[in-house]
From Swiss-Prot:
One of its GO terms (molecular function) is protein-exporting ATPase activity. InterPro entries: Helicase_ATP-bd, Helicase_C-like, P-loop_NTPase, SEC_C_motif, SecA, SecA_CS, SecA_DEAD, SecA_motor_DEAD. This is Protein translocase subunit SecA. Part of the Sec protein translocase complex. Interacts with the SecYEG preprotein conducting channel. Has a central role in coupling the hydrolysis of ATP to the transfer of proteins into and across the cell membrane, serving both as a receptor for the preprotein-SecB complex and as an ATP-driven molecular motor driving the stepwise translocation of polypeptide chains across the membrane. Monomer and homodimer. Part of the essential Sec protein translocation apparatus which comprises SecA, SecYEG and auxiliary proteins SecDF-YajC and YidC. Induction: Repressed under conditions of excess protein secretion capacity and derepressed when protein secretion becomes limiting. This is regulated by SecM. It is an enzyme of class 7 (translocase). Residues 855-891 are annotated as: Disordered. Belongs to the SecA family. It comes from Cronobacter sakazakii (strain ATCC BAA-894). Keywords: ATP-binding, Cell inner membrane, Cell membrane, Cytoplasm, Membrane, Metal-binding, Nucleotide-binding, Protein transport, Translocase, Translocation, Transport, Zinc. It holds the Pfam family SecA_PP_bind. GO terms for biological process: intracellular protein transmembrane transport; protein import; protein targeting; protein transport by the Sec complex. It is found in: Cell inner membrane; Cytoplasm.
Length: 901
């Protein structure tokens, strides 16, 4: 209460920010008459003038009013569109490293031209980030005439483009592309084998469209480039046969309770756990299938991977539903994005889950993948010097933007007042009653010519509604992941009088729904239309537009509440754009996922006690409030998950930055011989110390062991025992020096054969490949550590601190291994002629090119990389899965260190 009173007196932070910015808007408006008098050439010359002023030390903030005024004037001349004052406010918010919340239809695409132009003046590049390739291309083509009029180059960074074209796109002043593509290019650049292979410049300014979708909904999805791991498809098929034998454990107070089941399900956490009874049955079935020996336990160390397969299969059957979480198309399991309802072609679940779903659906099981490089969007976008974003719905997530990305949210006012009517929710007892009520509402609305947009949360639900509409004889369009190609056409015509459109979640985001339909789409269908035809189409459209306005505008029906209020607001935001009339209502039932999981049984019991008849609905502010509270609970839980993920990923991020910085330094330097010499000294010192401890007596020296180690690991045959017999005065220090000198001599002879330049190339190649190989293994080990670290909590230890401590120890060990393997590899390589080194180099280059091509072709989360060939080239010894582990534990390789590779 007190806060509300103070806000009334002093204004909110948002009001104060906008008040300050309105003064600048007045300045910009004051410049308009003078700029109108300039010729096109004089207006174009302003860009060069601004750049010259920047070089002399003026700041972007000083240039902002004049630069914005120039863009507005250019837009009037090129598009015949003048930026509204609220769009100038939005542009200033975006330049201030903030998030601008601008309602649907307020012209976010045109607003983005202002800060994009201003920040591109620095010459460091501006990245405009969109959610899909279609929007990136559309926005780039729409804005290209304006930017090119002002002397700015514009390019699109598309998936599947060859490296030279990508390099050109990044060299442009303003680059449009998707979040995935920017992230993958960053990872690919950090896997490059020469500076010429890199495509990105230093990350300067990112302007993120639909920022909530990219920085919040996608934040839990890491971008992963991976290579194939070993084939275990048969095991997935065998384990898949076991799952149908298991019975789900119901709650004791539920109607279906029949005693202890084989597994329990936690829908909130999306987890499944075997019960004692389930464990016994699974072990029996595994023995029967011949996968496990009798008397063995599923929890024994040797069966950890088997346990992992069982859990993955169980999750695939219980938690993942066809046409909700994924679709099966052309014998392939394709993930459906839970937030947008779009299919994510090429993306695969990790940890064997995707293979388990493939086994469940009986399609071909593709090999598991092994991570070669990964980064989360949270960490990628924090690499930019300057970050800003815009969306129609950010205010509900303002706290998360502020705490994770240090971005403040500013709500930009609408150009015209909002007059949409948001009607209270209606809650029914069953799903069937709810669908009947929705059909009745649609009949009433379409009878008076009002267009209706029905929002569903999954493909399955959209098909249920579609069947009900077909049964009722109502014509309609369905917009979901299965009908991806027609998306923009369907959305464009969804405002036609009496049109009914069913859309999964926010499919079609970024395309406006025009009341009366889109006359532009009709014109585009005609071949070379005449002026009269265009005038006639516009006149017909105006009649339809007026008819829709008279009927009440676009009506939105939500078929259930989403986990996030923001996505509900996005659905509502499709109606009432730019001051148009409109209405919205959500229909819910007690069988909806959100109500079942989070709204307590009290509501259902209360509805029963009230003696509600079938078909009756509850409509009360209390119910709406209870649902909003349930959504808040889910939002805060999801925020905690993302925050937790970020805290763990920050540890990996520090290591990633260190490795990538080191790698880029290696790439940029032509000669790394000094580094190699320094590493050689460290490695030989450690090797000799292991057999000749410092300041020790001669009796403690292990000379045969040292000779054998030098021969096996460094291909160095030295008669150390003979030296000691012949020269009794040789002491520890002089012996060390002699061994090191001998190693250098052998290496120098190799260099003489092939030439210094060729040897430098070879050293660099070995260093980069070994670094990549060990980094890949380190990522896998970090994944395993991350999965089990929460168990440390039972020992009264802080899992996060334990993770930091152990991962640092693993990182230090990895760097030691790097030194050892590099020296071992370059010492063992037998070089006789320069042609041989050239052949090795050529082989490595071809491998790198093939890898890059595969990544470009697949343009997916799970990009393919040939890791096996790298191992052969660097001379690593291949260990069979059933061979004894080289670490000396006595276990088979597959049950020891083989699990990490």
């Amino acid at each position: 209460m007190l806060i509300k009173m103070l806000t009334k007196v002093f204004g909110s932070r948002n009001d104060r920010t906008l008040r300050r910015m309105r003064k600048v808007v007045a300045l910009i408006n004051g410049m308009e008459p003078a700029l109108e008098k300039l010729s096109d050439e004089e207006l174009k010359a302003k860009t060069a003038e601004f750049r010259a002023r920047l070089e002399k030390g003026e700041t972007l903030e000083n240039l902002l009013p004049e630069a914005f005024a120039v863009v507005r004037e250019a837009s009037k001349r090129v598009f015949g569109m003048r930026h509204f004052d609220v769009q100038l406010l939005g542009g200033m918010v975006l330049n201030d490293r903030c998030i601008a919340e601008m309602r649907t239809g307020e012209g976010k695409t045109l607003t983005a031209t202002l800060p994009a132009y201003l920040n591109a003046l620095t010459g460091k590049g501006v990245h405009v980030v969109t959610v899909n390739d279609y929007l990136a291309q559309r926005d780039a083509e729409n804005n290209r005439p304006l930017f090119e009029f002002l002397g700015m180059s514009v390019a699109v960074n598309m998936s599947g483009m060859p490296a030279p074209a990508k390099r050109e796109a990044y060299a442009a002043d303003i680059t449009y592309g998707t979040n995935n593509e920017y992230g993958f290019d960053y990872l690919r650049d950090n896997m490059a084998f020469s500076p010429e292979e890199r495509v990105q410049r230093k990350l300067h300014y990112a302007l993120v469209d639909e920022v909530d979708s990219i920085l919040i909904d996608e934040a839990r999805t890491p971008l992963i480039i991976s290579g194939p791991a070993e084939d275990s498809s048969e095991l997935y098929k065998k384990v898949n046969k076991i799952i149908p034998h298991l019975v789900r454990q119901e709650k004791e107070d539920s109607d279906t309770f029949q005693g202890e089941g084989h597994f329990s399900v936690d829908e909130k956490a999306r987890q499944v756990n075997l019960t004692e009874r389930g464990l016994v049955l699974v072990e029996e079935l595994l023995v029967k299938e011949g996968i496990m020996d009798e008397g063995e336990s599923l929890y024994s160390p040797g069966n950890i991977m088997l346990m992992h397969h069982v859990t993955a299969a169980l999750r695939a059957h219980v938690l993942f539903t066809r046409d909700v979480d994924y679709i099966v198309k052309d014998g392939e399991v394709i993930i459906v994005d839970e937030h947008t309802g779009r299919t994510m072609q090429g993306r695969r679940w990790s940890d064997g889950l995707h293979q388990a779903v493939e086994a469940k659906e009986g399609v071909e099981i593709q090999n598991e993948n092994q991570t070669l490089a990964s980064i989360t969007f949270q960490n990628y976008f924090r690499l930019y010097e300057k970050l800003a974003g815009m969306t129609g719905t950010a205010d509900t997530e303002a706290f998360e933007f502020s705490s994770i990305y240090k971005l403040d949210t500013v709500v930009v006012p609408t150009n015209r007042p909002m007059i949409r009517k948001d009607l209270p929710d209606l809650v029914y007892m069953t799903e069937a009653e709810k669908i009947d009520a929705i059909i009745e509402d649609i009949k009433e609305r379409t009878a008076k010519g009002q267009p209706v947009l029905v929002g569903t949360i999954s493909i399955e639900k959209s098909e249920v509604i579609s069947q009900a509409l077909t049964k009722a004889g109502i014509e309609h369009n369905v917009l979901n992941a299965k009908f991806h190609a027609r998306e923009a056409d369907i959305v464009a015509q969804a405002g036609y009088p009496g049109a009914v459109t069913i859309a999964t979640n926010m499919a079609g985001r970024g395309t406006d729904i025009m009341l009366g339909g889109s006359w532009q789409a009709e014109v585009a269908e005609l071949e070379a239309p005449s002026e009269e035809q265009i005038a006639q189409i516009k006149a017909d459209w105006q009649k339809r537009h007026d008819a829709v306005l008279a009927s009440g505008g676009l009506h939105i029906i939500g078929t259930e509440r989403h986990e996030s209020r923001r996505i509900d607001n996005q659905l509502r935001g499709r109606s009432g754009r730019q001051g148009d009339p409109g209405s919205s209502r959500f229909y819910l039932s007690m069988e909806d996922a959100l109500m079942r999981i989070f709204a307590s049984d009290r509501v259902a019991n209360m509805m029963r006690k009230l003696g509600m008849k079938p078909g009756e609905a509850i409509e009360h502010p209390w119910v709406t409030k209870a649902i909003a509270n349930a959504q808040r609970k889910v939002e805060s839980r999801n925020f905690d998950i993302r925050k937790q993920l970020l805290e763990y990923d920050d540890v990996a991020n520090d290591q990633r930055r260190a490795i990538y910085t080191q790698r880029n330094e290696l790439l940029d330097v032509a000669d790394i011989s000094e580094t190699i010499n320094s590493i050689r000294e460290d490695v030989f010192k450690a090797t000799i110390d292991a057999h000749i401890p410092p300041q020790s007596l001669e009796e403690m020296w292990d000379i045969p062991g040292l000779e054998e180690r030098l021969k096996n690991d460094f291909d160095l045959e030295l008669p150390i025992a003979q030296w000691l017999d012949k020269e009794p005065e040789l002491h520890e220090e002089t012996l060390r020096e002699r061994i090191l000198e001998s190693a250098k001599e052998v290496y120098a002879r190799k260099e003489e054969v092939v030439g210094a330049e060729m040897m430098r190339h070879f050293e660099k190649g070995v260093m980069l490949q070994t670094l990549d190989s060990l980094w890949k293994e380190h990522l896998a080990a970090m994944d395993y550590l991350r999965q089990g670290i929460h168990l440390r909590g039972y020992a009264q230890k802080d899992p996060k601190q334990e993770y930091k401590r152990e991962s640092f120890a693993m990182f230090a060990a990895m760097l030691e291994s790097l030194k050892y393997e590099v020296i071992s590899t370059i010492s063992k390589v037998q070089v006789r002629m320069p042609e041989e080194v050239e052949a090795m180099e050529q082989q490595r280059r071809e491998e790198a090119e093939r890898l890059a091509q595969m990544q470009q072709l697949s343009h997916q989360d799970d990009e393919t990389a040939a890791a096996a060939a790298l191992a052969e080239q660097t001379g690593e010894r291949k260990v069979g899965r059933n061979d004894p582990c080289p670490c000396g534990s006595g276990k088979k390789y597959k049950q020891c260190h083989g699990r990490l590779s």
